[in-house]
Every structure is written in C-alpha cells, then in structure tokens.
Regions:
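Short alpha-helical segment of the dimerization/phosphotransfer core of two-component systems
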Residues: 7-12
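Helix-loop junction within the histidine kinase core
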Residues: 23-34
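Conserved catalytic submotifs in the C-terminal HATPase_c
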Residues: 33-38, 55, 60-70
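Short alpha-helical segment within the cytosolic histidine kinase core of two-component systems
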Residues: 44-56
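Conserved glycine-rich
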Residues: 59, 163-164
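Short helix-loop "hinge" at the ATP-lid/N-box region of the Bergerat-fold HATPase_c
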Residues: 90-91
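Short conserved segment of the HATPase_c
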Residues: 122-136
Length: 219
C-alpha cells in the first residue's frame, strides 16, 4: 500500500511539474540557467543510473560514444529531464529481453544524443504529430503504458530553448529519438556567474522516480 501511494504521488507530481513547465514556456517565463556542461558525462551518468530499473524488466541498456570529453552550453537540470523522458518512453515500448542504446556523437557544429530501442516502434500515422500535446501511441481504453501525453511536447520545448531540435529517425525496427544541440560554449565570465546562480537540484534517483512513475503494467 505504501509503495502504491508513493508511486501515485510521483505520478501526480510529474503531471503537475509538466503542466507548470508548459505554462511557463507558453507565457515566456521558463528561464534556463546555461553553463558549460560536460554533456558526455551527463548523458552517461543518467544512462548508468537506470540500469537497475531496466534490468528488473529484463531490458538491456548500453551507452556508447567515441567522445571522451565535451563541454557545451546547456542547462543540466532541463537536459536531465529530456533524457529521462526519452528513456522512459523507450522502456515503456520495449518488450522483455529488448535492447535500448544511448549514443552521443558530435561534429564541429552539433552534438547528437540518440536514444534507440528495438521495441514496438511508432506507427506512421502519428509520427508527424508525436511531439504535439496529448498525442499518445497507445490510445486503447485498457492501455498498459500510461502517460499524460505532454512529455514529448515538453521535451521538444526544452530542447528548442537550447536552440536545438529533437526528431524521430526513420528506422525499420523500434524507434530512435535524436536530440540535436549546438556545439558551442559560453564565455567563462557568464559560465562562472551562472554556476553561482544554479540552485541545488533534486537527487537523480528522485528525478528517475518521478519520470518513470507512469511505467507500470495493468492486469
């Protein structure tokens, strides 16, 4: 009972957080704190932190990159939410014994964060609308993959606030979401100032509990 109550509280908190943030974005009050962030470590740490969860669902997850270190202008708090949301979606639609891979690539202009899975994929009729609000892949009344339908819309908005874009690759199996961010840094004076402004964030495990709160099975 206690676990059910806690999970439902996390679900409600996730919904409220998403609605509040979408309202802030719509009204122009969503302010990000940009610093020079080590993006490879950020994505790797998030990926590794969810291994115990995906293993409990018999899903294999791997992180891969050829980049050792790379700092870019980024708001770590919002980028964590972006990556966790994409991973949450990948887990929802990946069957037991499935595979998820997270890949970081870069060229002179952009950084690419790829979240790939070999799950059921996304039907062609909603691919163009998948980042719109309240669009869900599973629309059945007895759907087992619950959600508010605003997660990917929020992902799109947060990435665009980074002057980036998020899109869905055309793959033959599963799905592949790509976050494309400018490969730029801010000057050190602004970076140091923003690091002082950056407030202490929630522990990563709590963020995972919130973002993954709607992954469950209905029997």
């Amino acid at each position: 009972y206690d676990n059910t109550l806690k999970q439902n509280c996390y679900r409600l908190l996730r919904l409220v957080n998403n609605l509040v943030d979408m309202t802030k974005i719509d009204s122009g009050y969503m302010k990000l704190i940009f610093i020079n962030c080590e993006i490879v470590s950020l994505v790797e740490d998030i990926t590794l932190s969810i291994i115990p969860y995906v293993e409990s669902k018999n899903i294999n997850i791997v992180f891969d990159t050829y980049i050792e270190e790379l700092e870019i202008r980024c708001d770590p708090e919002s980028m964590e939410r972006v990556i966790l949301n994409l991973l949450s979606n990948a887990i929802k639609f990946t069957n037991n014994d499935g595979n998820i891979s997270v890949i970081v690539e870069a060229d002179d202009k952009y950084v690419f964060i790829r979240v790939k899975d070999d799950g059921i994929g996304i039907s062609k009729d909603i691919r163009e609308d998948i980042f719109n609000r309240f669009v869900q892949e599973d629309k059945s009344l007895n759907r087992k993959n619950e959600g508010s339908g605003i997660g990917l819309a929020l992902v799109k908005s947060l990435v665009e606030l980074h002057d980036g874009e998020v899109y869905l690759e055309d793959v033959s199996e599963g799905s592949e979401f790509v976050v494309k961010l400018p490969n730029i840094k801010i000057n050190e004076e602004v970076n140091n100032h923003n690091r002082v402004m950056d407030v202490e964030s929630k522990p990563l495990v709590q963020k995972i509990n919130i973002e993954f709160s709607d992954i469950y099975e209905l029997y």
